[in-house]
């Protein structure tokens, strides 16, 4: 899968190539592509499988879906670091810390553009259409979070809407895209979507709790 991604994200420009290499090597554990591959295996029919690189239960369409969601996520993180003025990402310098925010914004846009281009070049329009709408949802979540960042009146419903749009929506799409990639029945696609949404909400709530505990633990009385 890593080679599949790298083969589609390269640049002849020296600076863009450096930024891409750094960003792609700073990616996390790949939760979203793992969800795509898991749900494709759960919903695929035995006679509807074309193996890629010897990997069981993984068709070229599934690889494409996994790549699309992972790189949309990667682009969103690059932009997140610019918005948050974050100097690090997973223990390494962020793109904006190394190459300034203006270049990092362009990098995020470049990754997003190459992701969409890869999807269209594949001619798998049902997959692209299924996944690409999540970009707008993520953007809405980012604006909502910014709107409520210093709002002491933020409600539980506000919080749930923010984490759904920023995090759970793409994990939900990842889960349903796995089913779409193997041409699963609509009922299976919907079940996987609901599973992904629940997983994404739980994932972000747990992450926020851990962040809060970390902040509380760092407070010292003087």
Task: Indicate where each model-derived feature is located.
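Mg2+-dependent prenyl diphosphate-binding active-site environment of isoprenoid biosynthetic enzymes
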Residues: 6, 10-215
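Conserved small/polar residues in nucleotide/adenosyl-binding loops
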Residues: 217-222
């Amino acid at each position: 899968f890593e080679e599949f991604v790298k083969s589609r994200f390269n640049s002849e420009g020296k600076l863009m190539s450096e930024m891409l290499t750094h960003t792609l090597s700073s990616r996390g554990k790949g939760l979203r592509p793992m969800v795509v591959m898991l749900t494709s295996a759960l919903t695929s029919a035995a006679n509807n499988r074309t193996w890629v690189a010897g990997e069981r239960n993984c068709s070229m369409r599934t690889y494409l879906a996994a790549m699309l969601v992972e790189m949309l996520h990667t682009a969103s993180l690059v932009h997140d670091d610019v918005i948050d003025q974050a100097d690090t990402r997973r223990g390494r310098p962020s793109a904006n810390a190394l190459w300034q925010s203006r270049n990092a914004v362009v990098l995020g846009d470049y990754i997003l553009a190459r992701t969409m281009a890869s999807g269209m070049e594949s001619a798998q329009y049902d997959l692209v259409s299924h996944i690409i709408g999540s970009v707008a949802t993520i953007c809405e979540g980012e604006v909502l979070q910014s709107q409520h960042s210093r709002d002491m009146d933020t409600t539980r419903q506000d919080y749930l809407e923010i984490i759904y749009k920023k995090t759970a929506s793409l994990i939900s799409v990842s889960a349903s895209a796995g089913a779409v990639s193997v041409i699963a029945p609509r009922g299976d696609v919907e079940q996987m979507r609901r599973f992904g949404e629940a997983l994404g909400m739980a994932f972000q709530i747990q992450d926020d709790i851990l962040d809060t505990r970390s902040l509380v633990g760092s407070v010292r009385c003087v």
